[in-house]
């Protein structure tokens, strides 16, 4: 899931990769032969060190190599530093990032950065926050499975907001891809993450926030205060966060915003429940989505009636003309129904072999859970919060100018 929706194009001779070799690069001597190979390239547009483990001294040597070799520094478009700290202590990770992140800011054409599968956590958040806020050239940021938690997630959201302001000042295009899955972002990160995403509304096409333990109020907050402003959204992946009816209603209101751009919608394992599923699928009967190719809706307690009353009529109306991949397994569907037979005839790879039984106790408890006041969307003074963030931006700029004058 922590992958781009496209394959970046590079000339083979301009790629330096030691990906997946499980090298233990601790000292400068450990990494020296690889840096010599890197420096020998006439041009390097992609650097891939993923699947190795790097220490502080080796990180310093790597940063120096990038900085001192213009054919690397001036040419880099993509950097993959995923899974780079296996078996490293937290102090080593922090010290490594102190060398690597600043040198990435010196690469004027670096657009794609993958930092996934590294145990960053709270100790590294200041370094990451500063890097993200000032990486004005970046277009595609992948930060998945980094052990963030809600507090770090909130600060990532603030960093995205500051990045947008810095991009505006530098006349650089906004972020196009933000992937931040498996990070335990939970509800606590939702407000500022929403504001951060909103600030890139003119650019963002891909947002993936799967497996973050976000509850209905947090999901609703993300959509209402952030995602609904992304007019060009093509791929939205919220898999394995919890919706229920409340967040489903907010999503249903936002969906028409993306009717012309949406290519893929992943709501697998989101527990929209029967009522929430109804609300979402009703949108497809009312609004045409001419570019929607992929719809993932597994394990959501969707009822057979939703398929028959909303989804099939939407298909018959021609409201989903390009839909080619459908996932609806694990819902409350009728295995022997004509409706499923019809869908299987339309979608060759459709899997419908896991059906959830309807439990009378589930039906009785569903309405009660969906009326939980704690899960409803909270009214937030976003204008005030955005103003406060802008004031922080001005203070930060003043501090940096002062530091420059002192030097």
UniProtKB/Swiss-Prot annotation:
Its main location: cytoplasm. The modification Phosphoserine is found at residue 360. GO terms for cellular component: chromosome, telomeric region; cytosol; nucleus; perinuclear region of cytoplasm. One of its GO terms (biological process) is nuclear export. GO terms for molecular function: GTPase activator activity; small GTPase binding. InterPro entries: Leu-rich_rpt, LRR_dom_sf, RanGap. LRR repeats lie at residues 11-39, 40-67, 68-101, 102-133, 134-166, 167-197, 198-226, 227-256, 257-285, 286-315, 316-346. The keyword Cytoplasm applies. Keywords: Cytoplasm, GTPase activation, Leucine-rich repeat, Phosphoprotein, Repeat. Present with 52200 molecules/cell in log phase SD medium. Belongs to the RNA1 family. GTPase activator for the nuclear Ras-related regulatory protein GSP1 (Ran), converting it to the putatively inactive GDP-bound state. This is Ran GTPase-activating protein 1. The lineage of its organism: Eukaryota, Fungi, Dikarya, Ascomycota, Saccharomycotina. The gene is RNA1.
């Amino acid at each position: 899931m922590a992958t781009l929706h496209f394959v970046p194009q590079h000339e083979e001779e301009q790629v330096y990769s030691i990906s997946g070799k499980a090298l233990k690069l601790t000292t400068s001597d450990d990494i020296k032969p690889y840096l010599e190979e890197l420096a020998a390239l006439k041009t390097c547009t992609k650097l891939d060190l993923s699947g190795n483990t790097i220490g502080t001294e080796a990180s310093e040597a790597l940063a120096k190599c990038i900085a001192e070799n213009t054919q690397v520094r001036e040419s880099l478009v993509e950097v993959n530093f995923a899974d780079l700290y296996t078996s490293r202590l937290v102090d080593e990770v922090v010290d490594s990032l102190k060398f690597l992140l600043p040198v990435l800011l010196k690469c004027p054409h670096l657009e794609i950065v993958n930092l996934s599968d590294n145990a960053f956590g709270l100790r590294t958040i200041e370094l990451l926050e500063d890097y993200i806020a000032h990486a004005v050239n970046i277009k595609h940021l992948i930060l998945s499975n980094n052990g963030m938690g809600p507090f770090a997630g909130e600060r990532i959201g603030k960093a995205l907001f500051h990045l947008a302001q810095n991009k505006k000042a530098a006349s650089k295009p906004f972020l196009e891809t933000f992937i931040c899955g498996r990070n335990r972002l939970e509800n606590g990160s939702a407000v500022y993450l929403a504001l951060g995403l909103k600030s890139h509304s003119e650019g963002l096409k891909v947002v993936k926030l799967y497996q973050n333990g976000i509850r209905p109020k947090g999901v609703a907050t993300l959509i209402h205060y952030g995602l609904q402003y992304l007019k060009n959204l093509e791929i939205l992946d919220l898999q394995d966060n919890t919706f229920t009816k409340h967040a489903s209603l907010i999503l249903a209101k936002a969906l028409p915003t993306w009717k012309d751009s949406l290519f893929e919608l992943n709501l697998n394992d989101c527990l929209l429940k029967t009522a929430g599923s109804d609300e979402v699928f009703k949108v497809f009967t009312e609004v045409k989505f001419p570019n929607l190719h992929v719809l993932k809706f597994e394990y959501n307690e969707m009822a057979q009636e939703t398929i028959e009353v909303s989804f099939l009529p939407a298909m018959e109306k021609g409201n989903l003309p390009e839909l080619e991949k459908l996932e609806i397994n694990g819902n409350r569907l009728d295995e022997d129904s004509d409706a499923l037979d019809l869908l299987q005839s339309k979608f060759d790879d459709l899997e419908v072999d896991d059906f959830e039984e309807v439990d009378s106790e589930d039906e009785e408890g569903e309405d009660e859970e969906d009326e939980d006041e704690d899960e409803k969307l909270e009214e937030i003074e976003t204008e005030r919060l955005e103003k406060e963030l802008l004031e922080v931006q001005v203070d930060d700029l003043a501090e940096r100018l002062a530091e420059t004058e002192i030097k």
